[in-house]
Amino acid sequence: TIDLVARLLNLKGSNRPGFIIVGSTPWTISLAMMMKELKAPVMVVDASWQRLALARQNGLPFYHGEILNEATEHNLDLTPYAVLVAATENEAYNALVCNEFAYEIGRDTVFQLGDAVDEDDRHSLPSSIRGRALFESGFGVEDVNERLSRGWVFRKTKLSDEFDFEAARERLPDAASSLMRQDPNRGLAMS
């Protein structure tokens, strides 16, 4: 049918939402590798060629350039990407990236590492310009990199009617954190 022809001609993208990951760190590379394993479109973006070395070594799609540069709009097709994760070491930069792409990708699908905003903290960035917290626990860049160095890994679990999300959570170690789930009916949901 027309759907099959469109796929064969590369006119139609994947059914899975793609991830654009800003910032090339060991943790973001692990996330990108898991997304690639799940056959979701993924792109790692960083302005540093050196930081992109791990992405290149792992055969991950990458973009070498400044995501906020106007030229990037012309050089990087964002069509396959429904989720943006800003995970550089600079929280203010991550917020700026999320704010910039919230209108194009959607405010509900731009995420950054770090805590949800405490509106009473005069040192924190306002929630109106930040991305959503990627983890419910508020893990920041240092937190995820430290956990990764201690053996933290991404795992995937196939859910079913007999083995649902709650049952899967019960089997995880106490220190485990759920990041996302893919539901065939409801799509991608960040946990």
Briefly describe each language-model feature range:
Residues 1-191:
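Cytosolic regulatory regions of ion transport systems
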